[in-house]
């Protein structure tokens, strides 16, 4: 039996109700709706009186936030000013791989627009390393976790009129259902539409209604169901838990062993209240669309194309605007499909749609009725203030009154390439191989009059080195069978530049068979001298390694890539990235002879 005193002590120590129930093995608590109070952060370290609207929750002492709010409301009433509409804005929480500063950008711009439109913006976030948690960004800031119980405490104190969940990434969007259950109005896309996009079965029904194709997929809860589903739809399959961010715990399974390994890991570490999703893996070009919707019309600032093909997380792929390799029919299809989603889901605000293009056919990968990590990028390079417009739509304005038109916005007169930045030297034992699980920790932007110059700028900004081959300079190749045909041309170009080529047994034999001179080198587990000795010689400029199977850090391919990272040798793990890098190497361009594009003065004359 849990006493009231024990319960209150547990709350003072920071335990949530659900944790207390589990540890005390009780179904009911001594008191319901025992809300926390809020203390003001002392930004002056007790040197003198501080009065900043920056609060943290506590079960010990008075509720300073309630007193602060009462004083402000009394001042407003005394001046005869109308009471402002209170809007709770949920931030993105701690920055981690998969959810970065891009979502904080969206939260901050949302707050600015709300304040500009006469609302009182109350921000909830618990990351001190962001702009959103600067004490003067919102009207008030609550430095508390983004979970239902903590949010309920804030709502009990603030009594807001509405909330915004679509600008804080997956962390904030998970609160939509709870907000709907407690009856707090959500500005923008309704909670049911968000669930319809996230829930596999409901999303499939949506696609049927809209007559939009997607890769066949299934929902599974255990290993037997996963194996049966994979056999039904055919290997390879993309496997991921539902309701995840950054492609977390996502893989491409090529055989039954991969499925067995994955399900063993996922059932141990992931809450199986949400199912695992299996999709037929479609090899093709991946594209991304961010759109602003007002419930009737929509505006697409631009279509982005990923350099790496499907199977590589969009956050780890080089992203190009405007798309370089799409036909007009494919572009028109994406615009049409995006409009269908916007209308059918009753989207108000932002929606992100990811597409795969294979053999001229456009497939939908997923739809996210929220902001995405590409919103700051596409806003900057097109001059379309997406978050500002989305918030105004949530407040009832129409796109047709905002001056940017509807449908697909005209392309900019330049090319912008977003290149991911990785921190593998700080992430020990992490395989550098690209895949559906996001690993990048940042990004840079390269802008130029044409694609190759913009790509070169982006790659240099991301830390790639462009070397002129010297005496004995060489490159190492160890690639999987499916990539070998495409690496023939890449290897030829490097050979033509003066590089000596080395390859592990299978890759070396393939290149020599196709008339590309290549020297065999023993793999990392072979007798010395082997590939490690070659890496340590100081002569290797680039490593091209796409051999990967499973997640075992003991595999030769994984150990090779880690060794390259330790020695600061560029290691390319995707054939598309390799082709782009080699084209830049051969162009002989540098930052000295690429013209500057000043986008600040090119926003359509603005």
How would you describe each model-predicted region?
Residues 92, 241, 367-369:
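Residues immediately flanking
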Residues 198-201, 244-248:
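Conserved A3 ("GATE") glycine/threonine-rich loop of ANL adenylate-forming enzymes
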Residues 1-6, 10-17, 71-85, 104, ...:
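ATP-dependent carboxylate activation and anion-phosphoryl transfer catalytic cores
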Residues 1-63:
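Non-catalytic accessory regions
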Residues 228-238:
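Acidic/histidine-enriched active-site and ligand-binding environments that engage anionic O-linkages
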Residues 20, 234-236, 258, 370, ...:
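Short alpha-helix boundary/capping motifs
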Residues 42-212, 221-228, 447-605:
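ATP-binding N-terminal substructure of ATP-dependent carboxylate-amine bond-forming enzymes
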